UniProtKB/Swiss-Prot annotation:
The chain crosses the membrane at residues 369-385. Heteropentamer. Part of the GPI-anchor transamidase complex, consisting of PIGK, PIGT, PIGS, PIGU and GAA1. Interacts with GPAA1. Interacts with PIGT; this interaction, via a disulfide link, stabilizes the expression of GAA1 and PIGK and links them to PIGS. It is an enzyme of class 2 (transferase). Ca(2+) binds at D79, I82, E118, D120. Keywords: Calcium, Disulfide bond, Endoplasmic reticulum, GPI-anchor biosynthesis, Membrane, Metal-binding, Signal, Transferase, Transmembrane, Transmembrane helix. The gene is PIGK. This is GPI-anchor transamidase. A protein binds at C206, S232, S234. Pathway: Glycolipid biosynthesis; glycosylphosphatidylinositol-anchor biosynthesis. It comes from Pongo abelii.
Length: 395
C-alpha cells in the first residue's frame, strides 16, 4: 500500500512538472500571438500635407510641403490618398524668375512642382476650419472626393504641417491660428470616429514641440523641428530667387527619405536622428508615449509608403495584344460576349524588382503547448482521483 502511495505521489509530481513546462510553452506561444496582434495591421495609408503660410518670403514653406509630397508619392501613396493644402501659389507668383516651378535645392537643381502636382486646397481655402473638417470628416456633402480624407480604423495617416508658430499655436495665413488644444481635440474626434489606426504627426515651425504637448489620444507619434522657446531656422538661401528655399529640419528629413525605397527596413528610430542640433541649430523633439509599438519596430514605409508595393516609372509602355488571345467566337445573338482568355498585359511590364508582399497572418488557433498542458492536467487529476493502480484499465 505504501509503495502504491509513493508511486501515486511520484506520478502526481511528474504530471505537475509536465503541466508547468507545457504551460510555459503555451505562455510563450500566447506572447507571440500578442506580439503579432500589436503589430500595425493597417490596410491603407493616407497623407495630409499642409503649408499654412502666404506671401513670397515664405517660399520655403511651400517648398517644404511639396518636397514631402514628392517623397510620399515616390514611395507609393497615390494622389487619391493625399490631401495637399497650399496657402499660396509660388509657382505662379509674379516674382518667380522661373514660372511654374518651385525649387528645393540650390542652383535650381530639383523642381518639386512637377506636371503631376494635384493641389486639393489652395490659397484662401487653406483655413483652420477646412483643415479641422478634413481631419474629422465634418464636410459638406457637395465636397469632391479629392478634398476628403476617406480613412478608416485600418488607416495609417501622416500629417505634415509647416508655417509660422509660437508656444502652443500655428498661424494660418497671418490671419488666424490653430492651438495645440484644438489639434489634440481633433485627433481625439478622429480616434472616437475610428478614422485612423496609427497617426504620425510632423511639424516644422518655431516652438514646434508645443503643438504635441496636449495630445492625449492613443496611437499617435509626433515629431517637431524645435523645442519650446526655440526658433526653427531656414536653409539654403538662393540669390537668383531672393529667398531661402527650405527649412533646415525638413531639408534633412527629405535627404533621409531620398535613401528610402518601398522595400526598406529603416525604422522610426532612424528618423529621430536625422537632424541633430549641430545641423538644425534648433533641437528637434519627438513624442512616443501614446504610441503602442516600439519605434524601432515601426518602418518608415508604415507611414510614408504604400501598403501595396508599387514601382513608379515615367516610361511610356506600349502593350501589344496577342492575336491568339484575341481570337474568340461570338454567338450570333450576343454582341458583347466576354473574351475567352484575359489579356496577360502584366508580363509586358518592365518590373525591375519584384517586391513580395508579406503573407497575411493566419487566424489565431490554440498553440500546441496549450493542448499538451491540457492533457497533463487531465492526467494529474486522474492520478489524484484513482491512483496508478487503475492505469491497466486504460491501456
Amino acid at each position: 500500500m505504501a509503495v502504491t502511495d509513493s508511486l501515486s505521489r511520484a506520478a502526481s509530481t511528474l504530471a505537475a512538472v509536465l503541466l508547468l513546462s507545457f504551460g510555459s510553452v503555451a505562455a510563450s506561444h500566447i506572447e507571440d500571438q500578442a506580439e503579432q496582434f500589436f503589430r500595425s495591421g493597417h490596410t491603407n495609408n493616407w497623407a495630409v500635407l499642409v503649408c499654412t503660410s502666404r506671401f513670397w518670403f515664405n517660399y520655403r514653406h511651400v517648398a517644404n510641403t511639396l518636397s514631402v509630397y514628392r517623397s510620399v508619392k515616390r514611395l507609393g501613396i497615390p494622389d487619391s490618398h493625399i490631401v495637399l493644402m497650399l496657402a499660396d501659389d509660388m509657382a505662379c507668383n509674379p516674382r518667380n524668375p522661373k514660372p511654374a516651378t518651385v525649387f528645393s535645392h540650390k542652383n535650381m537643381e530639383l523642381n518639386v512642382y512637377g506636371d503631376d502636382v494635384e493641389v486639393d486646397y489652395r490659397s484662401y481655402e487653406v483655413t483652420v476650419e477646412n483643415f479641422l473638417r478634413v481631419l474629422t470628416g465634418r464636410i459638406p456633402p457637395s465636397t469632391p472626393r479629392s478634398k476628403r480624407l476617406l480613412s478608416d480604423d485600418r488607416s495609417n495617416i501622416l500629417i505634415y504641417m509647416t508655417g509660422h508658430g509660437g508656444n502652443g499655436f500655428l498661424k494660418f495665413q497671418d490671419s488666424e491660428e490653430i492651438t495645440n488644444i484644438e489639434l489634440a481635440d481633433a485627433f481625439e474626434q478622429m480616434w472616437q470616429k475610428r478614422r485612423y489606426n496609427e497617426l504620425l504627426f510632423i511639424i516644422d515651425t518655431c516652438q514646434g514641440a508645443s503643438m504635441y504637448e496636449r495630445f492625449y489620444s492613443p496611437n499617435i507619434m509626433a515629431l517637431a523641428s524645435s523645442q519650446v522657446g526655440e526658433d526653427s531656422l531656414s536653409h539654403q538661401p538662393d540669390p537668383a530667387i531672393g529667398v531661402h528655399l527650405m527649412d533646415r529640419y525638413t531639408f534633412y528629413v527629405l535627404e533621409f527619405l531620398e535613401e528610402i525605397n518601398p522595400a526598406s527596413q529603416t525604422n522610426m528610430n532612424d528618423l529621430f536622428q536625422v537632424c541633430p542640433k549641430s545641423l538644425c541649430v534648433s533641437t528637434p523633439g519627438h513624442r512616443t508615449d501614446l504610441f503602442q509599438r516600439d519605434p524601432k519596430n515601426v518602418l518608415i514605409t508604415d507611414f510614408f509608403g504604400s501598403v501595396r508595393k508599387v514601382e513608379i516609372t515615367t516610361e511610356t509602355i506600349k502593350l501589344q495584344q496577342d492575336s491568339e488571345i484575341m481570337e474568340s467566337s461570338y454567338k450570333e445573338d450576343q454582341m458583347d460576349e466576354e473574351l475567352m482568355e484575359p489579356l496577360k498585359y502584366a508580363e509586358q511590364l518592365p518590373v525591375a524588382q519584384i517586391i513580395h508582399q508579406k503573407p497575411k497572418l493566419k487566424d489565431w488557433h490554440p498553440p500546441g503547448g496549450f493542448i499538451l498542458g491540457l492533457w497533463a492536467l487531465i492526467i494529474m487529476v486522474f492520478f489524484k482521483t484513482y491512483g496508478i493502480k487503475h492505469m491497466k484499465f486504460i491501456f
